[in-house]
From Swiss-Prot:
GO molecular function, one term: (3R)-hydroxyacyl-[acyl-carrier-protein] dehydratase activity
Name by which UniProt lists this protein: 3-hydroxydecanoyl-[acyl-carrier-protein] dehydratase
Source organism of this protein record: Chelativorans sp. (strain BNC1)
Family matches, as InterPro entries: FabA (IPR010083), FabA_FabZ (IPR013114), HotDog_dom_sf (IPR029069)
A Pfam family the protein falls into: FabA
Keyword Isomerase recorded: yes
Length: 170
């Protein structure tokens, strides 16, 4: 079932992780600590860079986040792959939000560029995905370009993020 809300708080995201937002067998977010954002600030089926829809989210950076003590000892940095995973998570959420059925899985991405780091000194990470295409066939496939901003500065870019929703065969 397509959603009508355009923003989601942390409790909504936890409901999605439990499979309660889009219904049984449909798109879910991972549960913490792998849930990589605290809120979805805006989602729309229209607009964005390509006019096919977009989603925006934020993560509040706290020095005690689980990855800082181990990546790296004495030099804490958020792993870049977690920022990339957040963009895949958002793309899957977008497909579920559209009302598309199936369980979400990251498939691939094109080019990824990192030009900065998320350290404990950062206050807020903003994420964005602009959808280029949603294909509906044996699976539902979302393709988009994404970015990550640390305190307003764009430091990650990813092109051609691909997420599929797969229906379970009986």
């Amino acid at each position: 079932m397509a959603q009508t809300k355009s923003s989601y708080d942390y409790e909504d995201l936890l409901a999605c992780a439990r499979g309660e937002l889009f219904g049984p067998g449909n798109a879910q977010l991972p549960a913490p600590p792998m849930l990589m954002f605290d809120r979805i600030t805006e989602v729309s089926a229209e607009g964005g860079e390509f006019g096919k829809g977009f989603i925006r989210a934020e993560l509040d950076i706290k020095p005690d986040l689980w990855f800082f003590p181990c990546h790296f000892i004495g030099d804490p940095v958020m792993p870049g792959c977690l920022g990339l995973d957040a963009l895949w998570q958002m793309t899957g959420f977008f497909l579920g939000w559209l009302g598309e059925p199936g369980k979400g899985r990251a498939i691939s991405t094109g080019e990824v560029k990192f030009s900065g780091m998320v350290t404990p000194a950062v206050k807020t990470v903003e994420y964005g995905v602009d959808l280029k295409r949603v294909m509906r066939g044996r699976l539902v496939l979302g393709i988009g370009d994404g970015w990550l901003k640390a305190d307003g500065e764009t430091i990650y870019r990813a092109s051609d993020l691909r997420v599929g929703l797969f229906k379970q065969e009986s």
